[in-house]
Every structure is written in C-alpha cells, then in structure tokens.
C-alpha cells in the first residue's frame, strides 16, 4: 500500500452503477470534494439486466430522485425508446411511468453528467481494501496498492461482492458476465462483525433481432402523447420511439424446461442465495405454477443501434443447450440465435438492520452502504439509496443535519425504513403497496414533496427552482380560479356539456370533484374560460381536487401517528430489563435496536401494546 502519495477527498464512492453514480453526483452537487472509483470507467451507469427504467413503485422512486436533483430521470428521458404509463385507468396513487431504454444512450448520458460535474473526480481501479482505524473509516486501497484517504466512504458494490455466476452445472467467479468479482473487499467486510448472507438474481439470454419473426407476435406500442420522467423534461428530449412485442411460452417450452431441471443450479443445490420473489426465473415459474400452460414474454429491444433483444420473462440459469432449445420452442423465436446466454449470479449482501437511517454502518463510522449490498433489487431502488447516502455523507462533512426522509414524505423513506427496521430476507423490491400513505406519495407531486428540501440542501440549480415555483404558482392560481368561477343554473350550454341540468349554481371546483367530470369536460364550458392546456398541470390539479377528502383523512392519520413516531430510543436501553414486554418482543428489540418508536412499531411481532409499554418505560426512564 502506497500511503506516501495518498490523495485525500472528503467523500469516496466505490462503484459506478446506479447507486454509485447518484451517490457521487449528490455529494459533489453539495460542494463536497468527491471521488468515484470504478473498476471500469466504460461501464458507468450500465444496465446489467433489463433495459428499462420505472414501473409500479419504481417509477415513483425515479420521480423522487429527479425531485432531489438526481440524474436517472433526465438520463432516461434522453435515452428512452418507448414510454408508457402503467395503471393509467386506475387511481393516481398507483399510476406509474415506465420507459424502455437504449442501453448505449443511457450509459452515455450518465457518463457525460459525471464527467462534467464540478467537485467530482473519476478513477479506474478495483478497490481491494478499506482503511479502518478504531472502527472509523479512513480511506480505501485499490488493486494496485494505491491509497485514497477520505472521511466518508460509500460502498455501492452491486452484485460484485463474492459474485459467482451459474449457467447449468458450470459456475465461475464474476461480478456480472465479463467482469471480475470483488473477493478481496468481500473478505475484508466479512472480517468485521457484520451480518452477511447470500442473495441470487438472474438474467435472460439476449437474442439476435434479425433471427426473430415479429409477424407471429403481438405488437406493443408506446403511449401517445409521450410521458416524460423528469419534471424538467420535454418530449423533444426523447429519441426515436419503437415498439416492443409480446409472445408466450407453451407446453413444449415447459416440457423442455422440466427435462433440463436436472442440470439447473437452482434445483441441484448449487445456488444457496435467495431469489427475487417478484422476478422469478422461468424454471421457477414452470415449477411453482405448474397449472399454467403459458407465461408472457415481453420482447424488448436493447437500443436503436444494436440487434440485441431482451426477452423479459425468461430469466434462467439452465444450461446453454437447454436455453437454446426452449427459446426456439416459443412462437416467433423458432430460429432465434442467442447472443449471450442467460445466467444466475450469487453475491454477498449485508443485513441492512446494521445501518442507521442515513445508511451509515452502525459499527464502522463514516462507511455507508447503498444498493444491492443492502438486499434490494432494481436500478431504481439502488439509485434512491445512492442519492440518500451521498447526501448524508456530504451533510456529515459539512456538519449539517442529516436528511432522514419519513414514510409519509417519500417512497425513499418507506424503502429505507423497511430495510433498516425489517431487514431483507429476500431481494427487496419497491411497490406502491408498501406505502401506508400512497395517495400522498404520487408521481405527480414528488417535486412538491421533495424539491424544497433539495433546494435547502443545495442539490438543484436556480433554473430548476424557478421552474418549480412557476409550476406551483400556476397550479395555485388555477385552483383559486376554479374555486371562484361560478356556473349558473341557467347556463344551458354548461348543462349540455355536463350532460345534466344544474339545479343551482356551482363553482368549477365543485363540478370537478364529481367522478364523471374531468378538466377536459369543464374546459368546454364557455362561461368558465380560460382553461389550462398543460397536461402535467391539469393532472396535478385534478388529483388535488378529486381526492381532497381522502388526502385530508391521510394527513389527519399522519398527525396522530407523528406524536410518537419520532420519539428517540437510546441505543443504551436494556430491553431485557423491561419485564412487561414479552420475551419475543424483548429479543426482537434487542436484535434490531430501533432508533425511534416509529421504527420499533414496524418490527414484525412488536404489537401496539408493546409500543404502549415502551412509551410508559420512556416516561419513567426520562423522569429519573
């Protein structure tokens, strides 16, 4: 280790994936001298699995990252080749944006942003060791023995820690196909008293677009008009749009897969890591859902300038021979050529209950974990954690209060609270169902919830802040106009538009509250003009007005809960001494060491009665 020439930074980020890039950018945007170290600069922002961003719950995270000044939304707006709004016919809480990405364009956008960010330097080299003295991080050591010193280090290792790739009975070490694992760093972390386990994820074989018969498949076009991810985005940012396609497995496919299970590492015991529940391999689906005679496959192009296609829905670790046979049994894939075989990968992750709310490791001061190392799965979940870790590392350097988003403020807050309170016994994926207050945490109001905080932290530009102010001033003015514009009962034209006679005068706001009346219908009423034309503003206004009653109720629930939510629990509490608690609850509180009453209440098995006992104990404890 060459300490004599060691260069110092305030924050070092290890890893250039989705967590690492957001961590490095957020730290640097706050004015902190930051170094991003990646084993390969060419893979910054690489999409290792599916070429897509967003989806249910995930799209909400992307909007929140954007509201906090992150790059993911802007990058996908400039690289997305198909955009769709999922759950468009359902309520606003569960509507979500999803975009198919051109991998090459996406990666280029990320790298360009990193290379042009003030206060941020890049360095290519694998990190093999951490410099830790008296349980305090001091820096890192690269593969060639170079030392870089820093007060804060953020580890975003993805699937690289102890990574092992499986294809049939063959397995070999790797962080992903074509990349070496981080075994030395994994060994270093395992030497500390951190709870470590193994998880598994997988990816499907990539196919040659020229060998597929799309005439046998169902076309899946994108939405019109095109949505955007970034609040600063415009449709003109999007590159050329192209369709995806849909096909299905069949009984022959399933028979071939069943016959190949004898060589499947998942079913022979070679893989011990736990798989993602909501993204199972095709062999897992065939076994678990044996009554089904087909499974849907989304045929997704990987870009505008490549022939590679991603068959979403057939992730597999079966042998190459079995992969080729079952792929060619699928309609439209009869002559398919596999460019890259599918594989499964096992890797180390560390129990996120060993983290503070800031994502700092409790046992090693100054070290932060973000991304799959914490047991999550998905680009969006990783990026959100990276953003949070980067902000909090910078806050610590600047001696500012940490950013601790709450469950009622953001999906980022929901995710982090779930992780540090409940842990992850399987790869954690974000869904809207995980949020108690999801009507407050819509995609359309992510900027309203978070951009003022981003402004306070120094994460956004003046242009972004001014755009935000203009938007919400327009929304406020229009809501006031709707409230104060009255339609008379004698207005026959309004009656025709509304398809009902008015028995007395109504404000436009009152009319908009009705289930079958939307803003577009109201805009046809001559006496109510002028109306807005911006679809984004209209959507926000409709959601605020139509769901005002439900929103008010959720806010009241939050206020009741808030009284005790943030009550601090000292790390020195001896839970074994609180005999009024059951032994099970005492053990769980001792294991998890929750920082607040709110966290304690979300530990599985900790009942409301247990929380009441804790509150009584705290009052007694504080009075001594």
Swiss-Prot record:
Predominant localisation class: cytoplasm
A Gene Ontology biological process term: tRNA wobble uridine modification
Keyword NAD: yes
SMART domains per record: GIDA_assoc_3
Residues that, per the record, bind NAD(+): 275-289
Annotated function: NAD-binding protein involved in the addition of a carboxymethylaminomethyl (cmnm) group at the wobble position (U34) of certain tRNAs, forming tRNA-cmnm(5)s(2)U34.
NCBIfam families: mnmG_gidA (TIGR00136)
The protein's name in its UniProt record: tRNA uridine 5-carboxymethylaminomethyl modification enzyme MnmG
């Amino acid at each position: 280790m060459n300490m004599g020439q060691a260069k110092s930074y305030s924050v070092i980020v290890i890893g250039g994936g989705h967590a690492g890039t957001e961590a490095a950018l957020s730290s640097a945007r706050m004015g902190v001298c930051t170094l991003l170290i990646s084993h390969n600069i060419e893979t910054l922002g690489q999409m290792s699995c599916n070429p897509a961003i967003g989806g249910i719950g995930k799209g909400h995270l992307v909007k929140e990252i954007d509201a906090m000044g992150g790059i993911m939304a802007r990058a996908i707006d400039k690289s997305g080749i198909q955009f769709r709004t999922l759950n468009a016919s359902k309520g606003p809480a569960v509507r979500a944006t999803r975009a198919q990405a051109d991998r090459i364009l996406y990666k280029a956008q990320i790298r360009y942003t990193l290379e042009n960010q003030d206060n941020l330097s890049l360095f290519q080299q694998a990190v093999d060791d951490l410099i830790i003295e008296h349980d305090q991080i001091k820096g890192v050591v690269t593969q060639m023995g170079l030392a870089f010193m820093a007060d804060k280090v953020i580890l975003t290792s993805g699937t690289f820690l102890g990574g092992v790739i499986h294809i049939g009975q063959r397995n070999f070490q790797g962080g992903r196909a074509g990349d070496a694992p981080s075994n030395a760093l994994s060994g270093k972390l395992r030497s500390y008293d951190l709870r470590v386990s193994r998880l598994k994820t997988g990816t499907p074989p990539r196919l040659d677009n020229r060998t597929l018969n799309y005439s046998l498949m169902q076309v899946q076009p994108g939405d019109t008009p095109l949505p955007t991810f970034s609040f600063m985005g415009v449709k003109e940012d999007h590159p050329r749009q192209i369709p995806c396609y849909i096909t299905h497995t069949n009984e022959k496919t399933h028979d071939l897969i069943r016959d190949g299970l004898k060589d499947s590492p998942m079913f022979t015991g070679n893989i011990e890591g736990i798989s993602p529940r909501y993204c199972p391999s095709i062999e897992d689906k065939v076994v678990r859902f044996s009554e089904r005679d087909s499974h849907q496959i989304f045929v997704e192009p990987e870009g505008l300038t490549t022939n590679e296609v991603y068959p979403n829905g057939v992730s597999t670790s079966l042998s190459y021979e079995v992969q080729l046979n079952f792929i060619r049994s699928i309609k439209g894939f009869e002559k398919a050529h596999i460019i890259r075989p599918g594989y499964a990968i096992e890797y180390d992750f560390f129990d996120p209950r060993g983290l503070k709310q800031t994502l700092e490791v409790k046992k090693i001061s100054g070290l932060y974990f973000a991304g799959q190392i914490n047991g999550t799965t998905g680009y969006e979940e990783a990026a959100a954690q990276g953003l949070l870790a980067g902000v909090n590392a910078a806050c610590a350097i600047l001696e500012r209060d940490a950013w601790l988003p709450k469950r009622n403020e953001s999906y980022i807050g929901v995710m982090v609270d779930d992780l540090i309170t409940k842990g992850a016994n399987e790869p954690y994926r974000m869904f809207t169902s995980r949020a108690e207050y999801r009507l407050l945490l819509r995609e359309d109001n992510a900027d309203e919830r978070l951009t003022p905080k981003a402004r306070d932290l120094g994460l956004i530009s003046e242009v972004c802040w001014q755009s935000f102010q203009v938007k919400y001033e327009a929304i406020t003015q229009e809501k006031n106009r709707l409230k104060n514009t009255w339609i008379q009962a004698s207005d026959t034209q309004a009656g025709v538009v509304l398809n009902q006679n008015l028995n007395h005068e109504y404000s436009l706001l009152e009319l908009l509250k009705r289930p079958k009346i939307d803003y577009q219908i109201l805009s046809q009423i001559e006496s109510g003009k002028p109306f807005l034309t911006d679809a984004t503003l209209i959507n926000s206004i409709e959601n605020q007005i139509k769901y005002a009653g439900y929103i008010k109720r959720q806010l009241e629930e939050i206020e009741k809960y808030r009284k005790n939510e943030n009550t601090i629990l000292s790390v020195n509490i001896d839970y074994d001494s609180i005999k009024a608690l059951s032994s099970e609850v005492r053990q769980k509180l001792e294991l998890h060491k929750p920082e607040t009453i709110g966290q304690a209440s979300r530990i599985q098995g900790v009942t409301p009665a247990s929380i009441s006992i804790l509150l009584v104990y705290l009052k007694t404890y504080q009075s001594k």
